[in-house]
């Protein structure tokens, strides 16, 4: 197994241009596919998740042209639903942002589609989405365990009408349903059961749908109305914002060991909720400066916080490791959906924090972290989870440094992360 040793870093300073958002990249690729006209996407993320989406779209007959560095994609829309005369089997790796939306989109047309993935994907729930699609007439069959991939879709289109969907596990299910609703045969009324998690991710979806010409009536995130007869129309060009979750590591670095770190590609005009991560750093004592398309973090002594971070679940992971450098006990609350991500992130985070000496209480939907008097060096397991690897790079700011196992797992969203991280040192 490959390992990366990060030696102690005294101070960080510099500027990082954040690669494109995974969430926006895969949403925009699917909407561009369903839209009428050709769309040019710039600052597209070049990563495993996006490659799985692009490979699947190509297999389904979608024509696109990629730039040499894979960050500009010119895609010819189908002007409607995806259909196939022959049965198709699509492998989606561990890409939830491809599996969930494609599962929904493929019910709209005609054909037989089987969706598979890596072993971890078979442990990531999709039942709430499938239940909702079945209410609209979809024929979906699980091939192994009920509620989980792999699955086969026998597509004949979706009817309109009222549909209930659970909102308390993952916002990706609602996102997938929203994106396909305009192409159903009738108007769709979506009723959300339970408290909707990760609402800012729904805001991303609604903003992109509007960019492609579709209007959704949002009744305080409890009910959504999508009137029949709407069509996606290409806006011509779509600029993919930098990934706000990826920005969190560099902002935390600035807060812990700045110096001054500036991230560009996200800022006060961002449609991503994870930019609110900077507000949490500010509450902890960091000096934060906002621009329209940049954020600057400067270091100071950090103090612990006790906060509900349901609205920034991915970026909240970075607070867990930043907490090792804060005075007091930090509590991150309402994060049950960490458990259904690339790994069970609550269990993984607790295990690895204890390795470096932290006192950790792992609850069902919270984590409580008290830093040790002296941080220990350790070998950090990453669980094939890109965010575990990037979060624990913060331990380079301890006096002992840290070893990261399987550092290449960052290829899911940020293949050259450690190279960029190293560029801030000195």
From Swiss-Prot:
Enzyme Commission code(s) on record: 2.5.1.19
GO molecular function: 3-phosphoshikimate 1-carboxyvinyltransferase activity
Annotated active site: 314
A Pfam family per the record: EPSP_synthase
Main EC class the enzyme belongs to: transferase
This protein's UniProt keywords: Amino-acid biosynthesis, Aromatic amino acid biosynthesis, Cytoplasm, Transferase
Compartment annotation: Cytoplasm
Reactions listed under catalytic activity: 3-phosphoshikimate + phosphoenolpyruvate = 5-O-(1-carboxyvinyl)-3-phosphoshikimate + phosphate
Binding site for phosphoenolpyruvate: 22, 96, 124, 172, 345, 387, 412
GO cellular component entries: cytoplasm
Keyword Transferase belongs to the record: yes
GO annotation terms (biological process): amino acid biosynthetic process; aromatic amino acid family biosynthetic process; chorismate biosynthetic process
NCBIfam families documented for this protein: aroA
Subunit comment: Monomer.
Name of the protein in question: 3-phosphoshikimate 1-carboxyvinyltransferase
Organism whose genome encodes this protein: Shewanella baltica (strain OS155 / ATCC BAA-1091)
């Amino acid at each position: 197994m490959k390992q990366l040793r990060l030696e102690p870093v005294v101070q960080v300073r510099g500027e990082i241009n954040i690669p494109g958002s995974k969430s926006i990249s895969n949403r925009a690729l699917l909407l561009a596919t369903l839209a009428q006209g050709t769309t040019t996407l710039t600052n597209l993320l070049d990563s495993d998740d996006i490659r799985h989406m692009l490979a699947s779209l190509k297999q389904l007959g979608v024509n696109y042209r990629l730039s040499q560095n894979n960050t500009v994609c010119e895609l010819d829309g189908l002007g409607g639903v995806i259909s196939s005369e022959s049965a198709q089997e699509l492998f989606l790796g561990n890409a939830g942002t491809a599996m969930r939306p494609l599962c929904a989109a493929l019910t709209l047309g005609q054909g037989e589609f089987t969706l598979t993935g890596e072993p971890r994907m078979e442990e990531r729930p999709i039942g709430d989405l499938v239940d909702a699609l079945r209410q609209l007439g979809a024929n979906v069959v699980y091939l192994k365990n009920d509620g989980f991939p792999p699955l086969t879709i026998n597509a004949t289109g979706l009817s309109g009408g009222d549909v209930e969907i659970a909102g308390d596990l993952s916002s990706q299910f609602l996102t997938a349903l929203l994106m396909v609703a305009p192409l159903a045969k009738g108007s769709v009324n979506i009723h959300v059961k339970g408290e909707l998690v990760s609402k800012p991710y729904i805001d991303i979806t609604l903003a992109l749908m509007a960019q492609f010409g579709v209007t959704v009536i949002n009744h305080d995130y409890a009910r959504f109305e999508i009137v029949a007869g709407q069509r996606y129309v290409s806006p011509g060009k779509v600029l993919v914002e930098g990934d706000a979750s990826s920005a969190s590591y560099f902002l935390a670095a600035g807060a812990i060991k700045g110096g001054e770190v500036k991230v560009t590609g996200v800022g006060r005009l961002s449609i991503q909720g994870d930019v609110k991560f900077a507000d949490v750093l500010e509450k902890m004592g960091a000096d934060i400066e906002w621009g329209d398309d940049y954020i600057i973090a400067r270091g100071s002594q950090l103090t612990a916080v006790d906060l509900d971070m349901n609205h920034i679940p991915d970026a909240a992971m970075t607070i867990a490791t930043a907490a090792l450098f804060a005075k007091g006990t930090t509590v991150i609350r309402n994060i049950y959906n960490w458990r259904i991500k690339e790994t069970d992130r609550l269990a993984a985070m607790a295990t690895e924090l204890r390795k470096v000496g932290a006192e950790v209480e792992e609850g069902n939907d919270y984590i409580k972290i008290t830093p040790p008097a002296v941080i220990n060096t350790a070998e950090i397991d990453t669980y094939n989870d890109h965010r575990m690897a990037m979060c624990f790079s913060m331990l380079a700011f301890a006096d002992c440094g840290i070893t990261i196992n399987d550092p290449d797992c960052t290829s899911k969203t940020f293949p050259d992360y450690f190279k960029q991280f190293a560029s801030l040192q000195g």
